[in-house]
């Protein structure tokens, strides 16, 4: 492997056998969630983030969405007269930024040479988290077994630091993979097909309304050598199924990988996705994603969280199951709160979503940021510094009739600063004449 230091998992088989598999955060297809299909916060999604790109995988194994934030933070009209404009804020909602969101509902299907069509996942599939952070959808078919998973990688700690909170955030992109194992007892030949919707969203706040109604189509969809590039003035996505055959026009592509598997043989297929607000940023993201194989990136990301969480145990001897649930819940709370945070490449905070995902895209609500950041700091204390710099400039609205407006927001900087000092002992931040120099 092209990695320094110890490797946790040297093969995918080793990972599937040894990785921790949550028995409590798992789900099958939910008809209500699928039928309702309102804002993203209403849907049953398993989420993961590297601090830059947030993704959600659903129980049908689809990469339902992924998004990367815009760098521009702007004021929200909060507490004033409702003019009926496109967006407005409420008390404690002062600032937001746009986000480049691909609502692709990306999926895999298998077309066998005998004419049989098999979906990568179905309503009987189970989705859960492996090693607490990785969404995995597992499906058993009569002929084969599949595991579909997706993740946005954390950077290598040995890499040249690009941010003040290195190795967070990671690159603006993700991997969407499927492992196919032939259990038919004979040789299997066919094609693995990748398909997805070409839809972007960059601003949305309408709770209870159909999210898909607010999507926009790319201005241009075109092949760029091995990449399918989808471009809109507010978003750009570059998609590549590795080793694939690419046919058709950009707005109606046919993407597949021919394969042949012996009995009991398995193969992992990978789609690389870069997603950025601007076209000029795409190759930069791809340059990082191409550095390692998905298994190598998984090891890097897994090592980061294992190092940060350590080994967590509980002393609930009377009820072991309750102890295991409590352990899973504590880890899940921290990870979900981390998933709410979006950072620039330099490590500065852009927003704290009101959920991962939230019905209001990329909007920070003052009542949420304090518990979210305090929770995350127990594993990733560096984010506290980024949050403090954000709040020092934005813990008040651009304009209000009231001096405090939202007390939760107003004092959030003090609460986070106290917890940061307790967890890190970083006195330099409070004594330096130029605190930003301490980054």
Where are these predicted regions, by residue range?
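Terminal accessory carbohydrate-recognition/targeting modules of carbohydrate-active enzymes
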Residues: 1-327
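Glycine-centered secondary-structure boundary/capping sites
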Residues: 114-115, 425, 439
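Short capping loops/turns at secondary-structure boundaries
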Residues: 167-174, 406, 410, 432
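A very general structural signal that marks isolated residues within well-ordered alpha-helical segments
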Residues: 184, 277, 378, 390, ...
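Short, functionally important structural connectors and interaction interfaces within domains
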Residues: 251-253, 421, 434
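Substrate-binding groove/exosite segments of carbohydrate-active enzymes
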Residues: 301-424, 429
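Single conserved hydrophobic/aromatic residue that forms the stacking wall/gate
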Residues: 430-439
């Amino acid at each position: 492997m092209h990695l320094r230091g110890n490797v946790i998992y040297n093969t995918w088989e080793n990972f599937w056998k040894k990785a921790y598999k949550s028995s409590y955060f798992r789900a099958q297809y939910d008809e209500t969630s699928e039928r309702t299909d309102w804002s993203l916060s209403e849907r049953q999604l398993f989420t993961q983030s590297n601090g830059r790109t947030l993704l959600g995988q659903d129980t049908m194994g689809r990469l339902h969405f992924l998004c990367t934030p815009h760098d521009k933070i702007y004021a929200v009209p909060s507490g004033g007269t409702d003019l009926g404009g496109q967006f407005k804020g409420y008390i404690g909602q002062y600032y937001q930024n746009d986000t480049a969101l691909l609502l692709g509902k990306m999926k895999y299907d298998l077309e066998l040479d005998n004419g049989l069509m098999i979906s990568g996942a179905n309503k009987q599939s189970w989705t859960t988290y492996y090693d607490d952070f990785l969404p995995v959808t597992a499906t058993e078919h009569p002929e084969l077994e599949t595991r579909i998973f997706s993740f946005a990688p954390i950077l290598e700690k040995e890499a040249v630091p690009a941010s003040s909170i290195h190795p967070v955030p990671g690159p603006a992109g993700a991997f969407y993979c499927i492992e196919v194992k032939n259990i038919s007892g004979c040789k299997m030949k066919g094609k693995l097909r990748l398909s997805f919707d070409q839809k972007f969203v960059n601003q949305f706040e309408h709770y209870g309304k159909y999210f898909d109604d607010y999507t926009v189509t790319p201005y241009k969809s075109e092949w760029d050598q091995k990449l399918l590039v989808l471009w809109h003035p507010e978003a750009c996505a570059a998609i590549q199924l590795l080793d694939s055959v690419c046919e058709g026009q950009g707005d109606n592509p046919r993407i597949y990988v021919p394969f042949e598997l012996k009995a009991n043989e398995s193969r992992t297929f990978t789609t690389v996705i870069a997603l950025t607000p601007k076209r000029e940023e795409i190759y930069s993201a791809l340059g990082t994603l191409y550095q390692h194989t998905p298994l190598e990136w998984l090891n890097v990301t897994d090592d980061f969280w294992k190092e940060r969480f350590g080994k967590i145990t509980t002393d609930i001897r009377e009820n072991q199951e309750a102890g295991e649930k409590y352990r899973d819940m504590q880890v899940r709370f921290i990870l979900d709160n981390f998933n709410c945070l979006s950072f620039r490449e330099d490590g500065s905070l852009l927003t704290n979503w009101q959920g991962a995902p939230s019905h209001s895209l990329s909007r920070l609500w003052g009542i949420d940021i304090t518990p979210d950041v305090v929770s995350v700091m127990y594993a990733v204390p560096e984010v506290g510094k980024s949050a403090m710099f954000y709040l020092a400039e934005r813990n008040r609205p651009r304009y209000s009739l009231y001096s405090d407006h939202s007390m939760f927001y107003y004092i959030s900087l003090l609460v986070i600063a106290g917890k940061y000092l307790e967890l890190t002992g970083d006195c330099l931040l409070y004594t330096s004449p130029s605190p930003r120099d301490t980054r």
